[in-house]
A protein has these predicted regions:
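Short, conserved active-site entrance elements at the starts or edges of catalytic domains
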Residues: 111-149
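Solvent-exposed coil/turn segments that connect beta secondary-structure elements
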Residues: 42, 59-61, 69-71, 84, ...
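Bacterial N-terminal signal peptides
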Residues: 1-7
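Gly/Pro-enriched, hydrophobic low-complexity segments
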Residues: 95-99, 119, 141-236
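N-terminal mature ectodomain segment of secretory-pathway/periplasmic proteins
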Residues: 17-92
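Short structured motifs
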Residues: 21-24, 51-53, 128-134, 187-190, ...
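Sec/Tat signal peptide C-region and signal peptidase I cleavage site
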Residues: 10-15
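Acidic/charged, solvent-exposed loop-and-adjacent secondary-structure segments enriched in E/D, K/R, S/T
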Residues: 90-120
Length: 241
């Protein structure tokens, strides 16, 4: 689900760069060879708020492993993505399951993200064609809106919109749509911070637009790029107690 976090740091402004080229540079900034993240997933379902903590290791766009550390109900839950497959291990059942088919559309641990969102980590410039929108930004003064159209009819979100600060060249908001054009997800990117050569959002707020009064906030407490990751983290053998 880390394709939500794209930003770009460079010279010039968005209008001077073709939309597709800008998207390629966004990808270049996002996709380090490897990443490690420690974060908090704060889930507000409109009635109560609960916080999950997790560590995640990512290699390129095809492999990732997440280990949930708290609260007690989710402690020990693990998720492993390799290519186009996603497995989940829960200590309560002491077994792993392959998340596929209709299961991918279900809410991930009660959050505003689906398991399909977890599978959306790919380079946007590879999966989408980009154009600049003529729509004016009412939410963010001076922002430019990028329209993204999926190249493959099987892509989960056929269209997206991204609000970009043309000076800092960072993403402020993203919207994701169904094939019908119905708005499904909205994401806000906040608390940008310089990490190495990257400008990265420390906070992201997700909203499932098919639900009422819910939101899921992801707080990144630790972010490290280009680290060495043991091979065992991307093996199914890690999906056990």
């Amino acid at each position: 689900f880390l394709s939500f976090f794209f930003s770009f740091v460079g010279s010039g402004i968005a209008e001077e760069i073709p939309a597709q080229k800008l998207l390629e540079r966004v990808d270049e900034n996002l996709w380090a060879n490897t990443k490690f993240v420690t974060g908090r997933l704060i889930i507000d379902n409109g009635r109560k708020v609960r916080t999950l903590t997790q560590d995640s290791w990512m290699e390129g766009t095809t492999r990732s492993y997440s280990h949930y550390k708290s609260p007690a109900r989710e402690k020990g839950t693990k998720m492993l993505k390799i290519g186009g497959k996603l497995w989940m291990y829960t200590p309560r059942t002491d077994r792993k399951i392959l998340i596929a088919g209709h299961l991918l559309r279900q809410s991930m641990l009660g959050s505003d993200l689906s398991y399909e969102d977890m599978m959306e980590d790919h380079k946007l410039s590879y999966s989408y064609s980009a154009t600049f929108s003529t729509q004016s930004s009412e939410d963010f003064a001076g922002a430019r809106i990028l329209n993204l159209v999926a190249r493959d009819k099987k892509t989960t979100y056929q269209t997206r919109k991204a609000w970009i600060d043309p000076e800092k060249q960072i993403v402020l908001k993203e919207e994701r749509f169904a094939k019908s054009g119905k708005l499904l997800k909205r994401i806000l990117f906040e608390d940008y911070e310089k990490i190495g050569t990257r400008l990265f959002p420390r906070t992201m707020v997700f909203r499932d637009m098919l639900k009422e009064n819910t939101k899921t906030t992801y707080k990144f407490d630790v972010i490290e790029f280009d680290i060495e990751i043991p091979a065992k983290y991307f093996s199914q053998s890690i999906l056990k107690r």
